[in-house]
Swiss-Prot record:
Record organism: Cronobacter sakazakii (strain ATCC BAA-894)
Listed name of the protein: ATP synthase epsilon chain
Molecular function terms from GO: ATP binding; proton-transporting ATP synthase activity, rotational mechanism
Pfam family, one: ATP-synt_DE
The entry's keywords: ATP synthesis, Cell inner membrane, Cell membrane, CF(1), Hydrogen ion transport, Ion transport, Membrane, Transport
Subcellular location(s) of the protein: Cell inner membrane
Source organism phylogeny: Bacteria, Pseudomonadati, Pseudomonadota, Gammaproteobacteria, Enterobacterales
Signal peptide annotation: none
Length: 139
């Protein structure tokens, strides 16, 4: 039997996941993180993107995170997300529209374009689409 640890994924609205997992993958402020059982204690900001949860017996779940904090303690990992949405709950049409709008905003020739904000919106839309794609494959 594979080693596991307890994971809690919590957003401001509700608890998204609580249970035993074999590992997770998430994007931290310094890059991609793979958290396995026995990982050293860690506290880091997480970037907008997804968390890949590998539950017992290799079953996978994907959750979109708009950002937040990851805390790793012995035997327990907590993700405090600003917003968390399960892959199956994401609306693909809305994500595609958000991506299109962000791309249009970036291409806009207006002088008042905030490229940092437009780029952040584009990254969020792309992350949502990736979560949708991976969730479909996992089903």
């Amino acid at each position: 039997m594979a080693m596991t640890y307890h994971l809690d994924v919590v957003s401001a609205e509700k608890q998204m996941f609580s249970g035993l997992v074999e590992k997770i993958q998430v994007t931290g402020s310094e890059g991609e993180l793979g958290i396995y059982p026995g990982h050293a204690p860690l506290l880091t900001a997480i970037k907008p993107g997804m968390i890949r949860i590998v539950k017992q017996h290799g079953h996978e779940e994907y959750i979109y995170l708009s950002g937040g904090v990851l805390e790793v303690q012995p035997g327990n990992v907590t993700v405090l997300a600003d917003t968390a949405i399960r892959g199956q709950d994401l609306d693909e049409a809305r994500a595609l529209e958000a991506k299109r709008k962000a791309e249009d905003h970036i291409r806009s020739s207006h002088g008042d374009v905030d490229y940092a904000q437009a780029s952040a919106e584009l990254a969020k839309a792309i992350a949502k689409l990736r979560v949708i794609e991976l969730t479909k494959k996992a089903m």
